[in-house]
Amino acid sequence: MVVNIEVFTSPTCPYCPMAIEVVDEAKKEFGDKIDVEKIDIMVDREKAIEYGLMAVPAIAINGVVRFVGAPSREELFEAINDEME
């Protein structure tokens, strides 16, 4: 099963680059086992509204917001592994 990860960011967000970096590391580690979509809320506001997001960065895994703020590498990898079980 492929784990779907959505990363919500905005151009003015100071913590978003850290969240993107951690997700990029996960993509390198997990490869085809995860599918990553990066969403700029200034461009695709509807998706953020669907999730009820009030802040970025935010990371949804398989349709559930798991992190608001940039998670550590360990936190993200653990959440991905939980979804794979």
From Swiss-Prot:
The keyword Cell inner membrane does not apply. GO terms for cellular component: cytoplasm. Pfam families: Thioredoxin_3 (PF13192). Residues 2-85 form the Glutaredoxin domain. This is Probable Thioredoxin. Disulfide bonds join 13-16. Keywords: Cytoplasm, Disulfide bond, Electron transport, Redox-active center, Transport. It is found in: Cytoplasm. GO terms for molecular function: electron transfer activity; protein-disulfide reductase activity. CDD domains: TRX_GRX_like. Belongs to the glutaredoxin family.
